[in-house]
Design a protein with these regions (language model features):
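Hydrophobic membrane-insertion alpha-helices, especially the h-region
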Residues: 2-18
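Short linear S-[DN]-x-LW-Φ motif typified by the pepsin-like aspartic protease active-site region
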Residues: 17-98, 116, 122, 135-140, ...
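Short structured motifs
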Residues: 41-42, 111-113, 203-204
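Residue-level preference for beta-strand/loop junctions
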Residues: 49, 109, 212-214
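Non-cytosolic head/periplasmic domains of membrane-anchored proteins
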Residues: 83-171
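Short, surface-exposed interaction patches in beta-rich subdomains
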Residues: 140, 147-150, 154-236
Length: 236
């Protein structure tokens, strides 16, 4: 009984704090309802692989999963607060959490979304901006560029095929499996207090490395997080 009373008082105190910070009562109600509903929604979009050129993921504390499907259109499974997933005029699909106009420490996001990609999709560019959420993906085929900006979250990507990879890592963890071998890539590494492991080699200092005949680039700016890059040893 005492624990319940203390929890209730703490919750009321946080709501009062939200009012003091200028939050609209409707924002508080909608935010709380969105956090407690937990209802999984499945949506199907008439978006085919040949219509998709780019993918942009922008999350704060939510979780994103990308899966490769056998269907000819996009399928979305989500719960929590997300912007509608649509195809823009330039062929970009954006996965984005709805904006929060205020934040309270006792609200922990449980937003999650799974995007099942249509069979055979190839992207020109994929961008991932992750605060303290998590992003995981099946294999991705990217012709031009993969851009990762990771704060304190975790990103785990399997079998990435791309010409150029840009990684800006704060205090989170990023794990990538790249197509090919270590010798298929050139590297620019700017390493802070974190660890960068490429294949079997651990890098703790800045480095620029060029491999003979390598045409692909990985550019790394690592803060205090950990980056691990492995290879699937396929022939490119």
């Amino acid at each position: 009984m005492i624990l319940i009373s203390v929890t209730a008082v703490a919750g009321i105190g946080c709501i009062i704090a939200a009012f003091v910070m200028g939050a609209d009562p409707r924002q508080i109600r909608n935010y709380a309802e969105g956090k407690t509903s937990g209802k999984l929604q499945t949506e199907e979009r008439n978006i085919r692989a040949d219509q998709i050129r780019k993918l942009n993921i922008d999350i704060g504390s939510g979780n994103v999963k990308l899966q490769n499907g056998n269907q000819d259109h996009l399928i979305i499974k989500k719960k929590g607060s997300w912007e509608p997933v649509i195809l823009k005029s330039d062929g970009e699909i954006e996965i984005k959490q709805k904006s929060r106009h205020f934040k309270l420490f006792w609200f922990q996001s449980n937003d999650e979304i799974t995007v099942i990609l249509p069979k055979g999709v190839t992207f020109e560019k994929v961008s991932m901006d992750c605060g303290n959420g998590d992003i995981a993906s099946d294999s991705l085929n990217i012709t031009d560029e993969l851009v990762i900006d990771c704060g304190s979250g975790d990103i785990d990507l399997t079998t990435i095929t791309t010409s150029k990879t840009e990684i800006d890592l704060g205090s989170g963890d990023v794990t990538l499996t790249m197509a090919g071998t270590e010798k298929d890539y050139n590297y620019n590494i700017d390493c802070g207090n974190g660890d960068v492991k490429i294949g079997d080699i651990l890098f703790e200092d800045d480095l620029k490395k060029r491999n003979i005949n390598a045409l692909r680039w990985i550019n790394i700016d690592c803060g205090s997080g950990d980056l691990t890059i492995d290879f699937d040893n396929t022939i490119l």
